């Protein structure tokens, strides 16, 4: 029997099959273009669509986890409207004459690194938020939807990490628990887990995310921070 340890976000015991959640891989290429106006227009359209999605998530979260917890999706909308973020994307498109996808990815990485370097714990957590909004815009630019956990039976979700948008879209009746390799007890995802009363562990760094665990029966001990 394998035992993996992590930090408990919400106490409780869960027993069930593991479902490994793999995020949609973004196909990112650096493509030169002379049509910078067209790329700027694509970015603006994708950003508008992302803000609309975030508003829908806010309304869903408002009903299910309350105004205080739903506020993260308002924060995400504000981050997408942030002047510095948008100026960075637009500047990269115009000066480097490249596609919108690449500009968004570079901007997201740069801003995430900036937040991670800050001394304040709360501000460091914003690195995950800026990556989340950037991935949402990238998904739209690539013609898809941002990842969503889908299952037809109650399972223990195991993932590298879960964004707040992915967490709030979990169908509580279908999720016995979730376990992530990375994450922080101060993250919005952890806060949402507590509010949704889902037993959860984070920081289970030795847990594999492959077929060796997918579909296997497991026990999540949210009281002692262990998965067996």
What residue ranges belong to the model's regions?
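Non-catalytic, soluble scaffold/interaction modules
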Residues: 1-228
């Amino acid at each position: 029997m394998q035992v993996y340890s992590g930090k408990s976000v919400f106490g409780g015991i869960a027993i069930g099959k593991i479902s490994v959640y793999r995020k949609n891989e973004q196909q990112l290429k650096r493509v030169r273009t002379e049509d910078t106006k067209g790329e700027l227009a694509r970015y603006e359209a994708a950003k508008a669509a992302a803000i609309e999605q975030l508003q829908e998530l806010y309304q869903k979260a408002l009903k299910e986890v309350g105004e205080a917890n739903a506020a993260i999706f308002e924060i995400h909308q504000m981050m997408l409207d942030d002047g510095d973020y948008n100026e960075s994307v637009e500047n990269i498109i115009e000066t480097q004459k490249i596609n919108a996808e690449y500009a968004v990815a570079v901007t997201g990485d740069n801003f995430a690194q900036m937040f991670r370097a800050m001394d304040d714990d709360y501000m460091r957590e914003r690195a995950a938020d800026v990556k989340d909004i950037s991935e949402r815009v990238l998904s739209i630019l690539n013609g898809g939807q941002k990842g969503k956990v889908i299952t037809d039976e109650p399972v223990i979700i195991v993932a590298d990490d879960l964004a707040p948008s992915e967490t709030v879209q979990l169908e509580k009746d279908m999720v016995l628990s979730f376990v992530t390799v990375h994450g922080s007890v101060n993250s919005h995802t952890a806060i949402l887990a507590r509010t949704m009363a889902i037993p959860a562990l984070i920081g289970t760094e030795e847990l594999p995310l492959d077929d060796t665990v997918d579909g296997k029966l497991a026990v999540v001990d949210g009281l002692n921070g262990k998965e067996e």
